[in-house]
């Protein structure tokens, strides 16, 4: 391969790789080993933006910080852009150095030499800079800085241009077969997309939907789409995204969803396009616990043969798998892992790096602990399209991902374990515990703080000591607890680095007596936007995306995002939507008489037609209380089934299997709004013919909800809406949406709470609910009977 400067050829395929991904991919070797904190330290080095800024700011005005560098390397069929961002470039005594900064919790004075891949990263930047500036010599500086003490250690090396050029040429030679393969794969993909047509006849309004998505991608914007059930949202987002890739508007599609069923639909949609001539690599990332072949996920060469020598074999395993499979399934990953004796989960992640379409959970893109660093860790914008399904889940999920907490009691647990192993760690834990004890004594129910400053410095000191100890530690009783604590504390400190005006820091004395400190991300919009900025465009879509301005404000910081409402193709005459006017689930109204009325409503609906019904409650307590009354009064008329807390996968499947289309007795299933059956289940046709939603779904009052309310009262005067009403109505809409899954379905939806007729709720309903009807306990039976008669 030869360098082509930055003059692109029109004939050759354009490829890209980051400097970091290049060196980590080529130079990895040896075992997976989670027994020490070495792997953890590598992650810690990726953090520490505060240290980066501080070091860069202290180096004087001649120091250039965050210097973007790129080089086009020419192959026979392709031009490969190698790109990245050097932490710093400076000149000293007439010599030029490229600086690579790494923050960590380890004591830097213990470093005898730089980490190999860090050195290789700096050498890549040094070569590019030397080549583009006609330099005869170039130096690199590795700057390691302790995040707690800010103690710094430097390593310097100097190279002639000939030396560093030979090193870089050898590196690119090693990567050559991968670049050639990627080029051939991309050319096949692009040619196939040109000939690809929409695989169905367009439904009414669907062609406009496809055009809106394509236009969003073309303009590199964000789109928020309210997409009612039945509009074909999966194909209507995937197809235009694929066509956009064919037009070189992007290079990779991430389809993100929190539910297995929607991931399966996405996979089936890509497979359908493949049957129609589309040629691309598609993979669904499976959770580690579902891929790990071991009873315990102990990722080390002693307990797991797949971990021993994993990095020596995994590149060959990936190369072989990519040559054999287009649609890469879980079974393909498992069999390939067996064939090459490599970790199936790591194989899955590595294979995803070479795939055109990646179907995965939100956390693989957004979670700061889990995100796919091979795609998102560099400061370079990727050619990615994000298709984010069931996006109403993103608000709460992102709050969880960008928040962190620690418990005082865990410090004491680890202190007892470490007493036998390290006096210095025991003392550091004792110091942290004393600080937490003082905060606990001052805390009533919960306390909000402006800063955790002094305490965080004590946590950093503890992290340094733990990191050093775990580097050398063999097995000892309680080590797993210590490792878990290490991860929790490290996450807390990493999240603390993100804390700004979008966070609330508070302590809470929980009901069981445990004392918690929390960094609560009340507004995740900035953190999400930073990750979205790593791609070209994003489409958020959901069947329950109302009010859309609420989601726009919490999922992005941009003010020029698009929003559309896809027209429903469903015939509203095939669905009865009724809302009660004479029942309430307010706390002040909850009583046996009110529960008897609710049970009466349920019976009046389900006895009009034999079939399967679901009733959704705001809590297990109310569900059980109403179930007792329902059994007393109506047990002989129907079969009753209740959702249980913490159901296993097998129990969930058994629950859903009871919903048969061919039944001669009515089944009534009680479940929880917002729970495992409240959304994400797909009971089509006559498997479910009615849903009754009890209450407005308001989250239970808690300290966290109070903090949210106070924050948004101050922010925009909508505290109750943001903390309670909007999350509640989403659960209601999701539960109601279990009935109508296709344009052929028929069914009854009944909402039981007089508050549903208030103006505040009236403004939140989808357009398709304009035909809602009032009802009461006296006439609801006739209303439902008349509906079934006209059907």
Which residues fall in each region the model found?
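Mg2+/Mn2+-dependent nuclease catalytic core
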Residues: 71-165
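Conserved RecA-like P-loop NTPase helicase motor core
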Residues: 581-593, 644-757
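A contiguous, basic/glycine-rich beta-loop/short-helix subdomain that forms a polymer-engagement track
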Residues: 333-353, 358, 369-376, 469-584, ...
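Signature of the SF2 helicase/ATPase Hel1-core->accessory helical subdomain module
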Residues: 237, 264, 338-357, 361-464, ...
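Metal-dependent nuclease catalytic cores that hydrolyze phosphodiester bonds in DNA/RNA
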Residues: 1-96, 120
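A substrate-engagement module of RecA-like helicase motors
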Residues: 190, 196, 249-358, 363-366, ...
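Walker A/P-loop
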Residues: 218-240
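Conserved pre-motif I regulatory segment
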Residues: 184-226
């Amino acid at each position: 391969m030869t360098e082509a400067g930055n003059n692109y050829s029109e004939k050759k395929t354009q490829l890209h790789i980051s400097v970091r991904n290049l060196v980590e991919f080529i130079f990895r070797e040896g075992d997976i080993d989670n027994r020490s904190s070495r792997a953890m330290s590598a992650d810690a080095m990726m953090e520490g933006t505060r240290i980066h800024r501080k070091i860069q700011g202290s180096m004087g005005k001649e120091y250039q910080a965050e210097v973007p560098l790129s080089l086009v390397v020419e192959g026979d069929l392709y031009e490969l852009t190698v790109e990245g961002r050097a932490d710093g470039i400076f000149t000293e005594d007439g010599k030029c150095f490229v600086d690579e900064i790494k923050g960590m919790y380890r004591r830097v004075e213990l470093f005898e030499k730089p980490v190999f891949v860090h050195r290789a990263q700096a050498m890549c930047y040094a070569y590019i800079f030397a080549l583009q500036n006609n330099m005869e010599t170039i130096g690199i500086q590795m700057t390691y800085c302790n995040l707690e003490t800010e103690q710094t250690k430097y390593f310097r090396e100097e190279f002639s241009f000939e030396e560093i050029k030979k090193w870089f040429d050898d590196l690119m030679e090693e990567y050559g077969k991968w670049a050639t393969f990627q080029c051939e794969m991309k050319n096949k993909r692009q040619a196939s997309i040109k000939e690809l047509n929409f695989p169905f006849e367009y439904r009414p309004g669907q062609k406009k939907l496809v055009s809106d998505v394509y236009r969003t991608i073309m303009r590199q914007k964000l789109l928020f789409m309210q997409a009612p059930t039945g509009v074909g949202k999966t194909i209507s987002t995937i197809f235009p995204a694929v066509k956009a890739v064919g037009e070189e508007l992007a290079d990779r599609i991430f389809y993100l969803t929190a539910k297995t069923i929607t991931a399966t639909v996405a996979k089936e949609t890509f497979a359908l396009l493949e049957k129609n001539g589309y040629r691309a690599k598609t993979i669904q990332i499976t959770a580690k616990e579902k891929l790990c072949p071991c009873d315990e996920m102990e990722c080390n060469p002693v307990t797991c043969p797949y971990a021993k020598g994993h990095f020596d074999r995994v590149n060959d395993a990936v190369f072989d798998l990519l040559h054999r499979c287009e649609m890469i399934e879980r079974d393909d990953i498992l069999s390939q892992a067996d064939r090459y004796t490599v970790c199936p989960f790591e194989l899955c992640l590595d294979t995803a790096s070479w795939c055109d379409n990646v179907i995965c959970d939100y956390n693989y893109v957004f979670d700061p602990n889990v995100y796919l660093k091979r795609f998102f860790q560099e400061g370079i914008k990727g050619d990615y399209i994000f298709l984010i399904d069931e996006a109403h889940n993103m608000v709460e999920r992102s709050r969880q991902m960008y928040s962190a907490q620690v418990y005082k009691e865990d410090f004491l647990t680890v202190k007892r374990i470490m007493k036998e192993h390290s006096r210095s760690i025991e003392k550091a834990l004792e110091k942290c515990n004393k600080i937490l004890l003082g905060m606990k004594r001052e805390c009533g129910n919960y306390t909000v703080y402006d800063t955790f400053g002094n305490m965080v410095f004590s946590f950093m000191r503890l992290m340094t000591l733990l990191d050093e100890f775990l580097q050398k530690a063999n097995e000892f009783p309680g080590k797993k607890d210590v490792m878990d604590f290490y991860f929790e504390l490290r996450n807390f400190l990493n999240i603390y680095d993100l804390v700004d005006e979008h966070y609330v820091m508070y302590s809470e004395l929980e009901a069981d007596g445990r004392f918690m400190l929390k960094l609560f991300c009340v507004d995740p919009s900035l953190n999400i936007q930073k990750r979205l900025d790593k791609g070209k465009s994003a489409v958020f879509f959901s069947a329950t995306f109302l009010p859309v301005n609420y989601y726009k404000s919490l999922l992005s910081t941009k003010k020029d995002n698009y929003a559309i409402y896809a027209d429903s193709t469903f015939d509203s005459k095939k669905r009865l939507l009724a809302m009660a006017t004479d029942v309430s689930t307010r706390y002040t109204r909850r009583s046996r008489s009110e529960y008897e009325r609710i049970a009466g409503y349920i019976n009046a609906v389900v006895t009009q037609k034999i079939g399967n019904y679901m009733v959704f409650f705001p809590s297990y307590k109310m569900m059980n209380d109403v179930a007792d009354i329902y059994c007393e009064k109506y047990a002989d008329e129907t079969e009753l089934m209740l959702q249980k807390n913490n159901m296993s996968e097998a129990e969930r499947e058994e629950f859903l299997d009871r919903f048969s289309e061919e039944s001669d007795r009515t089944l009534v299933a009680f479940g929880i709004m917002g729970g495992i059956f409240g959304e994400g289940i797909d009971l089509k046709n006559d498997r479910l013919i009615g849903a009754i939603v009890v209450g407005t779904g308001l989250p239970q009052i808690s300290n966290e909800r109070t903090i949210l309310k106070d924050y948004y009262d101050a922010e925009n005067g909508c505290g109750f809406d943001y903390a309670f009403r909007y999350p509640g109505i989403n659960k209601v809409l999701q539960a109601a949406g279990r009935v109508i899954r296709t344009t052929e379905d028929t069914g009854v939806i009944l909402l039981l709470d007089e508050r549903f007729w208030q103006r505040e709720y009236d403004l939140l309903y989808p357009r398709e609910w304009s035909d809602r009807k009032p009802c009461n306990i006296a006439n609801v039976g006739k209303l439902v009977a008349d509906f079934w008669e006209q059907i």
